[in-house]
Amino acid sequence: MKKLLSLFLTLTMIFSLAACGTQADTESSSESTSASQQSTESAESSDELPASEENSAESTRPVETGVFDLENGTVMLNSGYEMPIIGLGTFRLSDSECENSVYHALLYGGRLIDTARIYGNEEAVGRAIQRAIDEGICTREEIFVTTKMWTSDYEDGDAAIDASLERLGLDYIDLMILHHSQPSNDVEAYQAMERAVADGKLRSIGLSNYYDPEDFDRLVEATTIVPALLQNETHLYHQSREMKEHIAQYGTVMESWFPLGGRGQTQILFDDPTIVSIAEAHDKTSAQIILRWHLQAGNIAIPGSSNPDHILENLSIFDFSLSDEEMENLTALDRKERFADY
């Protein structure tokens, strides 16, 4: 009897264990299927980002160096700083004219101011900037200030940089450029600007009046920081296309001094039949057509003026655009003719 009872209990335990194993296998299979489904759903959902994430990725894409943003009126320099593409030049402006012109340029929304030690008006530029800041028109960070080191200062570039900072009344200068090619000592002057970048005194550095590709390359090969900008005489009759193509390989952008042709020469361009015809079609002035051409062609423009009305006119070039045909007709005006001999 005891043997029968023991056999019965043993069989019962065997059947119970078998049942548990079957249930465990079933649950494991169910969990595996569920995990597989979740994995598939996850893979399918990862094929496409949500719209918000896609937009976020789009908005964080880096801005391409040297490409003009005509909507915001800026260009990203190879130094990593954004620069306005239209501004005010101050060549030949007296102290009072300069201060008034810079103030009105800032008042009208301009944020690029160009001066130079040799112009003798850096202090006036500084006063106008401080006035605009004090009146809440803009902040220092919103203004892009360019000045230039004159050739006689190349022997002691470090002192020249400090002197410009003091005259401008600024803690840093957005862009300093060598005013002219001078092979005897421009490399040393440029190296002084490189040191000033490392010290936080300058943010970007560049060149002016280098018209020969070999001359530009000479300085680049002897220095460390590639010029962010080359400022040359550039206008519709002297478009500097070959030089611009050459410096583009370095990520260097072209800036035009005398973008309207220069004092004593502007009327020649203003009266050009092609320019007049396009101006009439857009109900704009010849100056506005020329400046718009510069921006669409990839030239930063710094027209000078002591007349607040003209300053406002020069800045008001973002409410229209030139067609491809109009750009081609204007580009065809190139005569490779310089009006100044610097």
Q: Locations of the language-model features?
A:
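Positively charged n-region of N-terminal signal peptides that target proteins for export
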Residues: M1-L4
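Beta/alpha (TIM)-barrel catalytic core signal, keyed to glycine-rich beta->alpha loops juxtaposed to Asp/Glu
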Residues: S181-Y342
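C-terminal motif of bacterial Sec signal peptides marking the signal peptidase cleavage site
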Residues: S16-A19
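Low-complexity, Pro/Thr/Ser/Glu-rich flexible segments characteristic
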Residues: D25-R61
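Short, acidic/polar
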Residues: S94-L106, D153-R167, F216-D217
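Bacterial signal peptide processing site
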Residues: G21-Q23
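N-terminal binding-site loop/beta-alpha segment at the start of enzyme catalytic domains
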Residues: N55-I143, L260-G262
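CE4/NodB-like, metal-dependent polysaccharide N-deacetylase domain
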Residues: D158-H179, R195-D199
